[in-house]
Every structure is written in structure tokens, then in C-alpha cells.
Amino acid sequence: DVSHFRLSFHLLFAFIILSLIFWNYLDLIYLKQNERKLKNFLPEIFMILIFLQIIFGAFVSGMDAGKIYNTWPLMGNSYFPDDNKIINLFEFSALSDASLVQYLHRNIAYLIFILYITIAFTVYKNKIVILFKPILILGFVVFLQIFLGILTLLSGAGILISSLHQFSSILLITASLYFLYRNKFSF
């Protein structure tokens, strides 16, 4: 049995290394000119949420939290897990409570989805053509990840679907980095 904290720490560093390698790859294949397309910081906030979600995904995996509350969109009969209290979210021990970790993982996914829709709307509204391809790729991967996450829950965290969900997080990181890179540099 591995501590979910150690598992998430290990996974986080693996994703940081992957991110640095992929960012350097993008530097090698594209000519850069510093010019942000989206003037706000939504892409950076999106990236932070993705990394946070991966950490909570590791918590879910390490605690087998995906094997409880195998319903969606509710957790059992309510939005919040009925074996807990909302006040418990504000205690450090929440990170070791399987139902709260699953609750947080679900809700970070909802935030990511809402933020993606906001960013995509901004890209298309402002006709930022250079970001059309990256935002479409990112959208496909976001929807894939959400779909696989829901299937993982409904399957009781079956090994095949859970593995696909974990693998697609790699695609999500790379698609997010690609969008962030294309937003930051024009070529």
C-alpha cells in the first residue's frame, strides 16, 4: 500500500518533467515571437487547475476513492457526500478522507469544464484564429477526460477504464501546454 501523498508527489514530478520536455519540444519546432493572444490569465489559471486536478486524481487512486459513490452526477443521494459535513472540507484531514477527495476531484473537473468553455468562447468571440486548432484539441481532450472519469466512477473504478482515464491525463497536460504555448508565442 502506497501513501496517496507520496503517489501524488511522484506523479506531480513526473508531469512536471513531461511538461518541461514538451515545452522544449514546442520551442524546437516553432519560431517564437512574444505576443499573448488572450490578454487575461485564464490559460495559466486553467493550467494550474489541471495540475491540481492531477494531484487529486492521484489522491483518488491512492485511496481507492473511486470505488465509493459510484453514481453520477450525485454522490449517492445528494450533491455532497452524505457521510460527511461541508465544514470538514476546511480541515487538513479532508485530504485523507476518501469521500471528500472524490468530491473535490469531481468539483475541480466541473471548474475545469466551465473555464474551458469560457476560454473557448473568448477565443471564438475575439476571432483569435491562431488558437482555433489548439482550443479544439484541448476541448476534445477535456471532454474525453470527463467522459472517462464518469465511466470510471460508474464502473466502480474498473482497472481498464481507470487506466484509460489516467492515460488521458497525459493527453490533457500536453493539450493544455500546447494551448498555453500557442497563446503565449505567435509563429
Can you say where each PLM-predicted feature lies in the sequence?
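Polytopic transmembrane helical bundles with strong interfacial aromatic enrichment
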Residues: 1-187
